[in-house]
Amino acid sequence: MASRNSVAVIALFAFVFAVISPFAGAQSLAPAPSPTSDGTSIDQGIAYLLMVVALVLTYLIHPLDASSSSYTFF
């Protein structure tokens, strides 16, 4: 019975060693480069923001223009 347990322990140790040993020679991954932003993306973001502001102002001002008495659709 003792030899059976020792064989099981040796088999378990061999299995764990076989699974872990390939990772011993593995190289660590290189760190990812830090994200950088260039001026073009910042300019594009500002342009989109200004376009949204212009669109909102257009929709806010247009109903005031349409409600005047001199405005006709045809």
Curated annotation (Swiss-Prot):
Sites where a glycan is attached:
31, 33, 35
> Could you describe the post-translational modifications of this protein?
Contains 4-hydroxyproline; hydroxylated on Pro-31, Pro-33 and Pro-35.
Modified positions (Pyrrolidone carboxylic acid) in chain numbering: 27
Task: List 4-hydroxyproline occurrences by residue.
Answer: 31, 33, 35
Primary location? membrane
Protein's cellular compartments = Cell membrane
Membrane topology type, per the record? Lipid-anchor; GPI-anchor
Which Pfam families does the entry link to?
AGP (PF06376)
- List membrane-spanning regions: none
| Removed propeptide positions | 38-74
Q: Listed disulfide bonds for this chain?
A: none
Q: Quick one: signal sequence residues?
A: 1-26
UniProt entry tagged with the keyword Signal = yes
Question: From which domain of life does this come?
Answer: Eukaryota
Q: Does the keyword Cell membrane apply?
A: yes
What Gene Ontology cellular-component terms does the record carry? plasma membrane; side of membrane
Residues carrying the lipid (GPI-anchor amidated serine) are 37
Q: Which family does it belong to?
A: Belongs to the AG-peptide AGP family.
Q: Function, please?
A: Proteoglycan that seems to be implicated in diverse developmental roles such as differentiation, cell-cell recognition, embryogenesis and programmed cell death.
State the name under which the record lists this protein: Arabinogalactan protein 20
State the organism of origin. Answer: Arabidopsis thaliana
- The gene it comes from is AGP20
